[in-house]
Amino acid sequence: MTERGGFEALDTCVHCGFCLQACPTFLATGDEADSPRGRIDLMRALEAGELAPDDPALRLHLDRCLGCRGCEPVCPSGVGYGRGIEAARALLATRRRPSALARVALWALTSPGTSRIVYALARMLRASGIPSWLAGWGRFRFAMGMLAATKGGGRRWKAVKGGERTPASTAPDRSRPPSSALLFRGCVMDGLFAHVHDATVRTLGVNGWAVREVPGQVCCGALHAHAGLREEARRLARANVAAFGDGAEPIVVNSAGCGAMLKEYGHLVDAAGFAARVRDVTEVLAAGGGPRPGAPVDVQVAYDPPCHLLHAQRITDEPLRVLAAIPVLRVVSFADAAQCCGSAGLYTLLEPAMSRAVLAPKLASLRTAAPQVVATGNPGCVMQLGAGLAADGVAAAVRHPVELLDESYRAAGYYA
């Protein structure tokens, strides 16, 4: 971390305005202060001492930032907006703690002891079916929809008749030992999306990877960094670096938000070697010749790229290559797919009105595209899109791409 703590990443901004149409909050409000360009002015003033940390306008517009980083790929000057906004939030957090709701959410979702109880209770509630019945608009009903969306399974698509057997040309190669990879489990993924971890291990196994779990790993620290709690994020980062050690094995992640954070450890705690090993599961599957083909699955899928996969990690084609390994499956395009869904970690809880405003145009586009499944690679996006679609009465499931590949492989006979 540099002496200026990340503010220097904003220095190259020349106020060209290319970022405006890439910013979901600017599109929602039309307010320059809710754009990256406007926020950079505010952050520069904060660093220079021209604005006090308790300035209401400063906090309003910085708190409204989703941190989606959609402005970064379109910026011709290479502004590191993501690092800048986290530096600003870290400075603000030294003067004012995050809100009570943010602190409670962090405690419930990421602290090891408490989160185990919280996730166990959430899984029990999810299994009861009550969240699905209560899903809708409004804070409580939307939260129920988010929980219902984490269930996974419940197949709404079928393998094409006659496609159940594995073609000889695609049978797993047992002539050489598998390569070794390490799985990063995370907190939300481990608590509510264990089925995605299982699908990750199985699909990687078909493609020649033996996946091991690593004891001692903890939360990636993304939610803490976004809240300005940089020292807590560093503590978690150091624990993960120590847990995974100095080997060369890739660290596989199936959460875009976690992956983006782990790849920032080089800047956060000078762990560039660790960061270089981090790979999204779709990167690993798509490497070389791409994933082995599975059985045909007759389903229409809309791929929604998570912001922290598309903008932060610049991963674009790999998830589509994973879906392309499923014969017959059709990927349909829809307008504004690259725009944020409004989830953004705790943002959907802390800024519900803006979160729903950002989500609205994406829901409208998905209604028009009419997919049977929306595929996306981040837990917050699965929950946000699942809750929004349910509230809107759209009968589309939301799944991680590896879940679809897993169904195809199961139908092909790679495993029972």
Where do the PLM segments sit?
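Cysteine-centered iron-sulfur cluster-binding motifs in ferredoxin-type domains/subunits
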Residues: F7-F26, R59-V79, A338
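N-terminal glycine-rich anion-binding loops that anchor highly charged ligand groups
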Residues: G17-Q21, D31-P36, A210-P215
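Short, intrinsically disordered, charge-biased short linear motifs at domain edges
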Residues: M1-L10, L51-L62, G205-G208, I326-V331
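Iron-sulfur cluster-binding electron-transfer modules in prokaryotic oxidoreductases
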Residues: Y81-A416
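Non-heme iron-sulfur electron-transfer modules
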Residues: T2, F26-A57, G78-R103, A395-L404
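Signature of N-terminal electron-transfer/Fe-S-associated modules in redox systems
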Residues: D11, T29-G30, A45-E50, D54, ...
